[in-house]
Amino acid sequence: MSEETFPQASALTLLSDPNIDLLSLVAAAGEVRMTYFGRQVMLHRINDIQNGLCPEDCGYCAQSKISDAPIKKYPLKSEEDIIQEAYEAKAKGVYRYCMVSSGRGPTAERTEHLAHIIRRIKNEVGIQTCLSAGLMDHEQAAVLKEAGLDRLNHNLNTSESHTPDIVTTHTFQDRINTLKAARSAGLDLCSGMIAGMGETDQDIVDIAYQLHEYQVPSIPINFLIPISGNPIYDCNQLTPQRCLRILCLFRFVNPKAEIRIGGGREGHLRSLQALALYPANSLFVEGYLATRGHSVDQVYQLIHDAGFEVAGETSLTGDLSATSQFQLDDNPNILNPQTTISFSNS
């Protein structure tokens, strides 16, 4: 399948038509994924290097100025803490270390400080890096590029028409301008969406094709995590099946992109998480910004149970041997009261 051949009408039908068999859809998306990425899954870890204290009014975000979510707010972590956590991420087999800082965007002084930290991480730790720090211009992006930053994240989050319903302190064009600034500075782009914020099928399709237009190589698909205190709490749009259809849509429209299962994976995909690895080839470990997530061990198990492999896999996979086979031991605490186990002397 070429990137130019998936029509928008088919994309809309894919999301809305219950007669399109879900497993057949997942299998077809899996064929596209296998063509470009094989069976490898890239692991990313988020480090929320500054939490809260944000002047923006994004309705979905626990860090925004209008949220009453009970989060722990803190200023930028120390340089040594950020670097130490990069070492820890690498030791766990993480492919890319993603630093996220709250706020509208960094000052010139903050940009230089972040560049210094990135330079140390690249020189001392040797891990792929991504930074999400809000709105930026070309000069700021160029400073980060010179420091060795591999990728800049700035999510579109939703379509241009739906953006005013989500946030009023910045525009959709502001976000596009940040992506353009990053690209002009030579940085790889990372940009995706949040599903479940009251958007229509057309909104989702619009985002998928907008990211295709900009040839974004890394696309995180987040599913709204309903955090009490946020204005956009729960639109009751998402089911495991719909989440899978959204992931398949993005794979068909952006066949060569790294499609990442982002926030909300555990709660919205639930028992269908393994199926999501057919359209997607990347996911986060150990949580997101304001919420916890599956541990590295749980993610490794999920990937291996589904028949995939971790990109750049380390010796961590050796730990799976002890849990790869199900065994029922003689511990009475896990037995049904009607079940007895007899042991022969032979």
UniProtKB/Swiss-Prot annotation:
Q: Per the record, what are the reactions this protein catalyses?
A: (4R,5S)-dethiobiotin + (sulfur carrier)-SH + 2 reduced [2Fe-2S]-[ferredoxin] + 2 S-adenosyl-L-methionine = (sulfur carrier)-H + biotin + 2 5'-deoxyadenosine + 2 L-methionine + 2 oxidized [2Fe-2S]-[ferredoxin]
Q: How is the cofactor bound?
A: Binds 1 [4Fe-4S] cluster. The cluster is coordinated with 3 cysteines and an exchangeable S-adenosyl-L-methionine.
Q: Name one GO molecular function term.
A: 2 iron, 2 sulfur cluster binding
Q: Does the keyword S-adenosyl-L-methionine apply?
A: yes
CDD domains registered for this protein in UniProt:
Radical_SAM
- Please tell me which top-level EC class this enzyme sits in: transferase
Its required cofactor(s), as named, are: [4Fe-4S] cluster; [2Fe-2S] cluster
What the entry lists under SUPFAM superfamilies is as follows: Radical SAM enzymes
* Known pathway: Cofactor biosynthesis; biotin biosynthesis; biotin from 7,8-diaminononanoate: step 2/2
InterPro entries cross-referenced by the UniProt entry: Aldolase_TIM, BATS_dom, Biotin_synth/BioAB, Biotin_synthase, Elp3/MiaA/NifB-like_rSAM, rSAM
Is 4Fe-4S one of the keywords UniProt gives this record? Answer: yes
Listed A to Z, the keywords are:
2Fe-2S, 4Fe-4S, Biotin biosynthesis, Iron, Iron-sulfur, Metal-binding, S-adenosyl-L-methionine, Transferase
| A single GO BP | biotin biosynthetic process
Superkingdom field: Bacteria
UniProt: [2Fe-2S] cluster binding residues:
98, 130, 190, 260
Q: Which HAMAP family match?
A: BioB (MF_01694)
- Give the family per the record: Belongs to the radical SAM superfamily. Biotin synthase family.
Which function does this protein serve?
A: Catalyzes the conversion of dethiobiotin (DTB) to biotin by the insertion of a sulfur atom into dethiobiotin via a radical-based mechanism.
Quaternary structure, per UniProt, is: Homodimer.
- Protein's name in the database: Biotin synthase
Q: Which gene encodes it?
A: bioB
